[in-house]
Design a protein with these regions (language model features):
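Hydrophobic helical h-region of N-terminal Sec-dependent signal peptides
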Residues: 6-14
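C-terminal solvent-exposed extensions
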Residues: 28-40, 44-60, 66-69, 80, ...
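N-terminal post-signal-peptidase region of extra-cytosolic proteins
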Residues: 51-59, 72-80, 86-91, 123-141, ...
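Flexible, polar/acidic helix-loop-strand segments at domain edges
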Residues: 61, 157-237
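Second-shell loop/turn segments in exported
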Residues: 77-82, 121-131, 144-150, 200-206, ...
Length: 295
């Protein structure tokens, strides 16, 4: 019996050491340079499949009682089931499940973060290519210590279905944007097709400003004007379009928190830019103060 136990222990140690070796496997200079070049191009799959990490529950902390800290990503992935596209927008959403109070923090996609095993920091928007929204949430936690426990990724074209399901979204259009969309300047209600055209109106320097603006507007307008019945129907439509670690119970809790209140919920949004591309201690403190301040 002792011999069998000893053999099992040895095998387990060998297996664990093998996993550790795989986890710590580095990149050759040529591999890394090829990936960096592909990330900067329009290649749909810049990271080799053998280098993509699958989500592990140990990457993220357990959820804080009474709250959900959710990383929300919009991706350019053509197939959300694979979810390894570049991130168009990265938002942290903290919801109080008792009051429905929600705070939405927009993160700079071009900020540099440390990726496990990588030889150098990379832009936050590229982390999704290596390990989806789960790995992105892990890197954000490492950089800013925000206690993100959940993630949700949606490709932007699928997100447009949500816009139509909501009956459109109101956006403030500049004269140039309005002309491109065959609409009038100012506040306009956009349908899904118009919203997709809106986010694709990119000029040098625009980055992903419109994607962030659209996501924030949809979340705000949904929280302010939705109903529980409508949101349950929307959740049924949304789930096939997303990659998430939210459970059914989590989703029910969120819907009840946001739409089951007897009064309108508080919804605040904030964004910041990273000086020289660095998420430093000052930005980490500001982010935590915004998400957790006053609690």
């Amino acid at each position: 019996m002792k011999r069998w136990l000893a053999m099992i222990c040895v095998l387990c140690c060998l297996a664990l050491s093998g996993c550790a070796g795989a986890e710590q496997k580095g990149w050759t200079q040529e591999e890394w340079e090829n990936v960096i070049m592909a990330l900067a191009s329009d290649d749909e799959e810049p990271v080799p499949e053998s280098r993509r990490a699958s989500f592990r529950s140990g990457w993220l902390p357990s959820a804080e009682k009474g709250f959900i800290n959710l990383l929300l990503i919009s991706s350019d992935a053509p197939d959300i089931d694979r979810n390894f596209g570049r991130a168009d927008a990265i938002l942290v959403c903290r919801t109080n499940l008792w009051t429905g109070e929600t705070r939405l923090l927009s993160l700079p996609e071009d900020a540099l973060v440390t990726l496990p095993e990588a030889p150098e920091p990379i832009a936050l928007r590229y982390v999704n290519c290596f390990g989806g929204a789960g790995l992105t949430a892990r890197c954000v936690n490492d950089a800013l210590n925000l206690g993100i426990s959940h993630f949700c990724a949606v490709n932007i074209e699928a997100f447009i279905e949500i816009v139509d399901a909501l009956g459109g979204v109101t956006m403030e259009l500049t004269e140039g944007e309005a002309q491109a969309l065959d609409a009038a300047p100012g506040a306009q209600r956009l349908n899904g097709d118009q919203a997709l055209r809106y986010v694709k109106l990119r000029r040098p320097g625009d980055g992903s400003i419109r994607v962030r603006a659209l996501l924030t507007a949809v979340l705000r307008q949904t929280a302010e004007g939705g109903s529980m019945k409508r949101m349950v129907s929307l959740a049924d439509l949304l789930l096939p379009c997303v990659d998430t670690n939210l459970t059914t119970d989590d989703i029910v809790d969120l819907i009840f928190a946001l739409f089951g209140q007897s009064r309108p919920v508080s919804f605040d949004a904030m964004g910041f830019s990273a000086k020289d591309g660095v998420l430093n201690a000052e930005l980490a403190a500001q982010s935590r103060e915004f998400l957790y301040g006053g609690e």
